[in-house]
Design a protein with these regions (language model features):
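Short, low-complexity, intrinsically disordered N-terminal peptides in bacterial proteins
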Residues: 1-2, 319
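Bacterial N-terminal signal peptides
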Residues: 2-11
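A Zn2+-metalloprotease active-site environment signal
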Residues: 12-319
C-alpha cells in the first residue's frame, strides 16, 4: 500500500504535477524520507504563525501491511505499521521505530483497522487534548507501551512532485517540491530553504490573496480595459519577496543554516543563464534583488539571535 496518496496539485506557477506514490518497492522512498526529515522541523518552527491551520504532531506516519503474528497475535492478517519516524520529534524520543506494528491507541485496539482510520483516530484524540498519546506496539517479537507528547505544527501536507523542473508549490493546504529540485539541492539546508519559502506562502495566505486579486483584476479588466492586468506581475513579485522574508525566519527557527539561501540562488542564477524563462522573469524578483534583500534579512535575524531574542519577523510589514 502507498504511504502517500496519488493526486494532482496546482503549483505556484501554472504547472501541474503528479504527486509521487511512495511504497517500499520504489526508488522514491529515500527522497520521501529526506523530504519529511527536512520538512517536519520547519512546520513546527512556523506553528506560531499558522494558528488557524495548526495541529499537534508527533512526527510519525503509518501504513497498512500484511504481517506475520507478533507475540500474542492472532495469526497472519493486516496490521498498521510505522512507515516513518522523524529523528528529532516526539515519536522518536518515546522510542517508536520504523516497522513497529500498532496494537492499540490509548487502550483502543486498532488491529484490522486501516492506517488512514488509525491516523484519524490519533488526530481526534490529539485535538481533544488527550495527552499523552499511548501507543501499544509490536516490537521485535514483543509488545511495548509508549507515551508520546505532541508538539504544535502547521497543518500542511508535504508532497514530492514528479517533474524535472526545479520548482516548489504552495496552495494554502499543501507544500511540495519537485524531484528535479530534490536532485538540484546540494544540502538539507538548501532543501529547507525551498520548503520554508513555500510554507511562508501558506502562512501569509498568499494563495487566497492571489485568488482575490485575480477576481478583482478580471472585474477591472472587464470594466476599465486590459491595462488593469499590468499590476499582476508586480503583485506576484511582492508576494515572492514577502515569502522570502518570512521563509528565512522559519528556516532559522528550525535550526538550518540560512547562509545556504545565498548559495542556492547563486546556483539557480547560474543555471538560468541563457535560458528563456519569461514567466519567472516577470513574476519573480531578480536574483540580485533577492540576494540584496536576503542580506538585510540575515542581518536582522543575527541581530535578534546574538542577544537571545525570539526570532519573530515583522509580519505587519510583510503582509
Amino acid at each position: 500500500m502507498p504511504l502517500w496518496l496519488l493526486c494532482l496539485l496546482a503549483a505556484c506557477s501554472s504547472h501541474q504535477y503528479e504527486i509521487i506514490r511512495g511504497d517500499e518497492s520504489t526508488s522514491s522512498v529515500p527522497m520521501l524520507v529526506r523530504l519529511h526529515d527536512v520538512a517536519f522541523p520547519l512546520l513546527v518552527a512556523a506553528a506560531d504563525w499558522c494558528s488557524v491551520d495548526q495541529e499537534p504532531t508527533y512526527g510519525f506516519l503509518l501504513k497498512d501491511e500484511e504481517t506475520l503474528p507478533i507475540q500474542g497475535g492472532e495469526g497472519v492478517g493486516k496490521r498498521v505499521s510505522v512507515a516513518y519516524v522523524h529523528p528529532r520529534l516526539p515519536a522518536a524520543s518515546a522510542g517508536l521505530m520504523l516497522g513497529d506494528q500498532l496494537i492499540s491507541v490509548n487502550e483502543r485496539t486498532v488491529t484490522g483497522i486501516r492506517a488512514e482510520e488509525v491516523s484519524l483516530l490519533v488526530r481526534r484524540m490529539t485535538v481533544a487534548r488527550i495527552q499523552p498519546l499511548q501507543l501499544e506496539v509490536g516490537h521485535r517479537g514483543g509488545r511495548q507501551i509508549l507515551n508520546l507528547w505532541a508538539v504544535a505544527a502547521c497543518q500542511f501536507s508535504v508532497q514530492l512532485l514528479e517533474s524535472n523542473q526545479i520548482n516548489g508549490i504552495a496552495d494554502g493546504r499543501h507544500v511540495g517540491v519537485t524531484t528535479g529540485a530534490m536532485r538540484f539541492v546540494r544540502s538539507d539546508d538548501e532543501l529547507a530553504w525551498m520548503l520554508a519559502h513555500e510554507i511562508a506562502h501558506n502562512v501569509l495566505s498568499h494563495s487566497q490573496d492571489a485568488q482575490l486579486r485575480a477576481m478583482l483584476n478580471a472585474f477591472l479588466g472587464a470594466t476599465m480595459g486590459a491595462s488593469s492586468e499590468t499590476s499582476v506581475p508586480f503583485q506576484r513579485r511582492s508576494l515572492e519577496t514577502r515569502a522570502d522574508y518570512v521563509g528565512a525566519y522559519i528556516m532559522a527557527r528550525a535550526g538550518y543554516d540560512i547562509q545556504a539561501i545565498k548559495q542556492f540562488w547563486r546556483r539557480m542564477e547560474s543555471l538560468r543563464s541563457g535560458e528563456n524563462t519569461p514567466e519567472m522573469d516577470v513574476t519573480h524578483p531578480t536574483t540580485a534583488d533577492r540576494l540584496a534583500a536576503f542580506e538585510i534579512t540575515l542581518k536582522e535575524i543575527q541581530e535578534k539571535r546574538d542577544p537571545g531574542e525570539s526570532l519573530q519577523p515583522v509580519l505587519e510589514s510583510t503582509q
